[in-house]
């Protein structure tokens, strides 16, 4: 029998309690899917031009998230990075650095960004530490827009905060 997990279909034998109860309140689905993916003997991709969470009005992706959400998302990304097989490391490192930059932009777009100053400072430390690293900020798989956003986060934070607040309207 097959079971669905956040719009993915898995064999029931594949899923474990630990995968599903991973201690996260946010990005728990991402981490559960990653853990299942790592132990799956194979997978099939069905192209669907949509994203169910964004299409659902009650989705958390439409609400401002509490500081814990930032911590949970960083924890999920760090575990994914730490557990990636060698052949996926370059891709996962790009994902990890992009997640740091995205989370910083998520904070900067908020009117109450000062409530997240601890998280933002931690993210900036991670972004700065990886800026010249060929596996992170200089990773060839990292989109230029993310490299530019990282640079703005570090070197022009006020301008970048203004841009985030005026042009990145979700999750304010």
Pin down the residues of each PLM region:
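Conserved nucleotide-sugar donor-binding catalytic segment
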Residues: 1-65
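Residue-level signal for well-ordered alpha-helical scaffold segments within enzymatic catalytic domains
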Residues: 13, 17, 35, 75, ...
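Short charge-dense sequence patches
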Residues: 20-33, 70-73, 161-168
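Catalytic-loop motifs flanking and including active-site residues across diverse enzymes
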Residues: 32, 76, 96
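Catalytic core of nucleotide-sugar-dependent glycosyltransferases
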Residues: 49-56, 63-88, 100-103, 110-131
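All-alpha amphipathic helical-bundle segments outside canonical DNA-binding/catalytic cores
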Residues: 88-95
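Membrane-interface aromatic/basic loop that binds lipid-linked glycans or pyrophosphate carriers
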Residues: 109-172
């Amino acid at each position: 029998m097959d079971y669905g997990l956040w719009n993915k279909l898995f064999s029931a034998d594949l899923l474990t309690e630990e995968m599903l109860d991973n201690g996260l309140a946010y990005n728990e689905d991402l981490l559960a899917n990653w853990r299942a993916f790592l132990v799956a003997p194979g997978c099939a991709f069905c192209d669907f031009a949509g994203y169910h969470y964004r299409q659902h009005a009650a989705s958390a992706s439409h609400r401002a998230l509490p500081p814990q959400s930032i911590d949970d998302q960083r924890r999920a990304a760090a575990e994914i990075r730490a557990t990636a097989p060698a052949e996926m490391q370059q891709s996962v490192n790009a994902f990890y650095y992009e997640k740091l930059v995205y989370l910083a932009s998520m904070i900067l777009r908020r009117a109450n960004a000062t409530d997240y100053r601890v998280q933002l400072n931690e993210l900036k430390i991670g972004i700065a530490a990886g800026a010249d690293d060929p596996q992170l900020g200089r990773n060839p798989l990292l989109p230029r827009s993310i490299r530019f956003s990282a640079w703005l986060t570090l070197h022009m934070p006020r301008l970048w905060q203004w841009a985030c607040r005026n042009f990145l309207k979700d999750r304010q």
